[in-house]
Structures are given as C-alpha cells and as structure tokens.
Amino acid sequence: MFQATSTGAQIMHAAFPRSWRRGHVLPLRSAKIFKPLACLELRGSTGIGGFHEIELKVRDYELDQFGVVNNAVYANYCQHGRHEFMDSIGINCNEVSRSGGALAIPELTIKFLAPLRSGCRFVVKTRISGISLVRIYFEQFIFKLPNQEPILEAKGTAVWLDNKYRPTRVPSHVRSYFGHFQCQHLVD
C-alpha cells in the first residue's frame, strides 16, 4: 500500500470503489435538437421585432441603498414580462399549474447596461427565440422610457415540467401558440 521514493518520502496508493468515481458527463445536446419556430429568424437578429411589450414603473421599495433598482429586482421584471407574454398568447401560467404542470427557469443570464431609479418608466420586451423538445428559449430587453435607453439584456431557458417536476415535452398546443405569435408579428 505504501511505496518509498528516492527521497525517502512515502507515497500511498488508494483505490476507491467504482461507485465513488464520477460518471462521464455528456455534453448538453439541446443545441443539436434545437429547432427554431416557424417564421422566426435566429441568425444574429438585432431588430426588435416580434416582441411582446409591457410598460412598468419603478417603485420605491425596489431600490437599494444607492437609490437605484436592486439587481435582484430585474429578474422579477423579467418574470413579469414572461408571464404577461404567455398570458397574451393564451397560456395561463396558473392554469398550467392547476393542471399539474410547471414551467421552470433553470438558466437566466442578465447583462446590466444602465440603472433605473425611483419613478422611472420602462418597457419590458419579451420574445421566444427558439424551442426544443422540452425547452423554450427567450430573450428579454428593458428600455427606459421615453427615450428607449437600453437598461438590460437577458437570455434564458424555460423547461416544461410534469406533475413530478421532471422535464417533459412542450405540449403541441403551446408550440402552436408561440408559432402563431411569431408569424403574426413578422407580418405586422
């Protein structure tokens, strides 16, 4: 078990049971099965088309000690924008919950560009950028009104869950709602 080296130090060889070894981690495959929605342009689009918009106002209790909106509050703004977007296309999140399903956000990347202060009016723009078997990919932007100053960029992933909170396929009727919204807004 111990082995001596030329310097006199001892080396201990340890054998760990196979069950302790970390399994081989496979790369994420979502990129391979990712399918854009019909009528949706995904190649580096910088245009702000096909977005659902909701206007909000900063409330005093959302501020931090420096007089600007606390970073954690922006995730709430994004969630509100996503819920309003889904409600506008006919998907009621409360109804999804009552039917035993759920929608989880395992990944949300937020890039802060400028702060919001008390009383600022702003718009949250939300769109679905793609969909896979169990994931919905979305983009969100916050712009300060009235001059449309960029405040925040966010990208995230939503996962459809069954009643046991395991990932499941996005229902076909939900896919059709997203596709209809995108096609309708590309025509406008």
UniProtKB/Swiss-Prot annotation:
Main location: plastid
Entry's localization field: Plastid, Chloroplast
Protein EC: 3.1.2.-
Keywords, ordered alphabetically: Chloroplast, Hydrolase, Lipid metabolism, Plastid, Transit peptide
Active site per the UniProt annotation: 64
GO molecular function ontology, one term from the record: fatty acyl-[ACP] hydrolase activity
Tissues/organs with expression: Expressed in endodermal and peridermal cells in young and mature roots, in boundaries of stem lateral organs and developing seeds.
Coiled-coil stretches: none
Keyword Plastid included in the entry's annotation: yes
Function as written in the Swiss-Prot or TrEMBL entry: Acyl-ACP thioesterase involved in the production of fatty acids and beta-keto fatty acids. Can produce beta-keto fatty acids of medium chain (8:0 and 10:0) and small amounts of 8:0 fatty acid when expressed in a heterologous organism (E.coli). May play a role in suberin biosynthesis.
Family in the record: Belongs to the 4-hydroxybenzoyl-CoA thioesterase family.
PANTHER family, per database record: 4-HYDROXYBENZOYL-COA THIOESTERASE FAMILY MEMBER, NOVEL THIOESTERASE SUPERFAMILY DOMAIN AND SAPOSIN A-TYPE DOMAIN CONTAINING PROTEIN (0610012H03RIK)
Name this polypeptide is given: Acyl-acyl carrier protein thioesterase ATL2, chloroplastic
Organism: Arabidopsis thaliana (Mouse-ear cress)
